[in-house]
Amino acid sequence: MPPFAKPETVLKRSEELINVGQHQAALAALNEIFTSRRFKQTPLQSLEPIMLRFVDLCVDLKKGRMAKEGLMQYKNVSQNTNAQSIELVIKHFIKLADAKVVEAQSKADAAVGEIDVDDLEESETPESMLLGSVSADQNKDRTDRVLVTPWLKFLWEAYRTALDILRNNARLEVPYQQIANQALKFCLQYQRKTEFRRLCEVLRQHLQNVARYSHHAHAINLTDQDTLQRHLDTRFAQLNSAVELELWQEAFRSVEDIHNLLTMAKKAPRPAMMANYYEKLARIFMVSDNNLFHAAAWNRYYALARSIAKSEQEHTQIASYVLISALAVPVISSNAPGTGNLHKSKSDFLQADHEARSRTGRLTSLLGLSRTPTRAGLLKEALNRDILKKARPELRELYNILEVEFHPLSICAKIEPILASISQDAEMAKYVKPLHSVVLTRLFQQLSQVYDAVKLSKVMQLVSAFKAPHSYTPAEIEKFCLNACKKGHLNIRIDHVAQAITFQDDVFSTDVHPAASASSEADNVGLQASPSELVRTQLSRLATCLDTTLKTIDPTILADAQAAKRHVFARAVAAAEDEHKAAIARKALLARRKELLEEMATRKEREEAAARAERARAAAEAEQKRIAEEQKKREQDRLNKEVEAVRIEEAKKMAKSLQERGGLKLSEEELANLDTDKLVQMQVEQIEKEKKELAERLRLIHRRMDHLERAYRREEAPLLSADYERQKQEDLQYHKAARITLLQTSKDKHAADLEIKKRLTRILPDYQQLRSIIEDKRRGEFEERRRKATEQIELEKERRRQQVRDERRRERQEAEEAERRRVQEEQEARARAEEEERLAEQRRVEEAQRAELEAKKRAEIEERRAKFQATADKQRQREEEAEANRRSRAAGTGAAPAQELAAADATWRRASGSPAPTQAESQRPPIFGAARTGGAGGWRERLAAKEAAGGNATAAPSAPAAAPAPASSGAYRPGMFRAAAGAGAGGRTDRVAATPLPPAAAAAESDGFTEVKKNVYRPPGRRA
């Protein structure tokens, strides 16, 4: 990895590369900053200009992925310390990309306009006209694909990158919403429908991830009113853009998003916002041909629009839309609950409800309704709000014809002019088709109450009032009747032979769904009761008649009934009072529980927020401390350098000053070697010397001045009296002249003042009148101000009292909380102390056991060492005795025969190769110097000593055989002791001299070590 370069150096290098046209190399140089290990420790003040230049190069070179990686790295560095920096960089990034799109669009427009025209008088030739009719705007589309589309794609990727970087961070929430709104405007401006769908998915995914990242330090809190309001504003902008782009599915999904956010809001949204919500929802329902919920949306919109300041014309228009949308709801599809179908089996209703319940429930919840709306309910609510008075006159007439009057033979002719008038309005023309369905339904309902059968030609004559394009054919009328029968609203039979329509009415028929008949009766205008209705209500009518007769014959029955009714009412009131008290108690209990739960949740949230803030504060303090330490260190280094420079400069100045005075003569080398203290000392000495010289000179001057001053005073004494007399005469003359001048000036001023008083006396009444007016006015203003000030003081006093009460209550709560935390901390500290004491006791026991084991091991080692030392001492004593015997025999004995030498050699070999000790124990290392000092060194030393004595190994008489070497005791012997024992036992030196060893063996023997056989340790039970 290359060494880390300073950000200023990298930026300067990139600027140089850009100036010579190497933009790619400049981008690579800037990108190396993000891969460095010290990137996170770099100050943001140095990184921000680098990021701006990096973004410029990425936009120029269309490096969207590289820009995303760099911005992500910069976000990780700056989000905890300076969120405004990343906001500035991302806005700069979006601004540059948008500028590139605008520039490309202008180039494309210019390219399309630059069409070569050979003949200015005939710019449009027949060939060009034919080609233009075939190719349309292919030239412009091709130019846009080449110039504009790549930059549009880059701008779209820039918006996605910005949203991905700014998401799910409370500090970056405001720029996130701004970028989201800009992205929506981008899709709307350039009609990017596909990108709009993807943008909606991205925003929806980010909102779903809010709960996943809720444990982060800077997570988004949707319970905060400002945050939720920003999300709502963005979703409303998304809804408006979807409606403008006519993406109705996305608009509906946006409505669901808004509804989900509204359910989370603790405070009701603004009426204007909700009015916009219902207006867009009404447009969506109109496009989806859902007339029932379209009318319900208009109804909800009107309820909010009344509270918004609008003109009378706007109120009339909105009321007209509410009324016509409710009238346009088809009667067939809105009568029965859910679907409104009549005369269906139970399974049919269950299947239909199962299919439509979820959809209807969703739509109902989106409108904020408690139950599914119906046509009758919407019309009733419209009447309760006096919409008929505010709606247009033709719509009021339409309502009367459809819902109030009964005229089956003229209903079509009366409604046709109204529908023609409505068709002229472009906004209301879309209600004409559903209104025709309502008119036909009302026509057949009213005909069924008057006729048992009617000719199809008669029906065609009645509907012939409708003009094209809303005219009907017999096939369409038949299809409508079959549809009404299929949905259970009408009971009609068509006779194709007689070309007639028969209205069937079964006297004993009943509705399968209990709510169907009630709904049908509410929507239908009845002239008379049908036979089935008469049969169905016969018992109720008979009971009513008998009850009326009894009350007429015996009035006491009515009195008893009223008394019983009053008694029942009294009992009901008492029971209701008890139930009311129980309900209040239960409500208070639930409220208290809810309050406790909210308090616990608030406390938990506050503690979590405090913990997050504490962690963030600790991290920020650590970072600030590190930065402060680095700054302090740099400042200290700078101060040290400055102090050193100042010290050197002062030393130079001081030395120069001393040289200029002439009392100090120093060379350049001496000046360089002297420090400030020495120079100060020299300067002090120089100053003391100058002071002494100055004092001596002053003493001489004073002595001379004393004599001179005495002579001066002796001469001036006679002249002082004459000068005093002259001064008195001059002072007297000056005093007289000044007094005369003062008197004259006072007289002139007095005369002028009298003249001024004479002139001002004429305006004195006006002055006094004006003064009284001004004083009265000022006095009134003063009293008003004093009254207001008094009121303000009282308000401030009351506010201060309330503030003091709040502060005392808060202090009391804080004291209680502090006491609770103190008790908890004491308990935790006590538990920690007990745990630490238990662990310390356990450690002491373990250490005592470990010390006891170590003492036992140490005693065993010392015991073994003492045994080994005693054995070694005995062995050394025996070796010393053997060496003494050998020396005593060395003078009179000769060399042994070859056989004895071989036998002795074999004996020595056997002694050397004795088995190794069974226990491997630590022994003292051999001391070769001690062995040589005792006379039992190597064979070369012994051979040299023998030759020096003049002995001959071959001519020496044979000595008696030495005693065999003692068997090995199994203990380890150092090399010194083994050599001594071998010499004493068999005369190893003599045998070596008599039988020379090979060079390899001699080299092996010269190292001073003895070969020891290595045996494998076996336990006592397994030894052979």
From Swiss-Prot:
A Pfam entry, by short name: eIF3a_PCI_TPR-like
One GO term describing the cellular component: eukaryotic translation initiation factor 3 complex, eIF3e
Coiled coil start-end: 575-717, 777-889
InterPro entries: EIF3A (IPR027512), eIF3a_PCI_TPR-like (IPR054711), PCI_dom (IPR000717)
Localization annotation: Cytoplasm
Biased composition, class Low complexity, residue ranges: 890-906, 946-971
Family membership: Belongs to the eIF-3 subunit A family.
Protein name stated in the entry: Eukaryotic translation initiation factor 3 subunit A
Annotated source species: Mycosarcoma maydis (Corn smut fungus)
Record gene name: TIF32
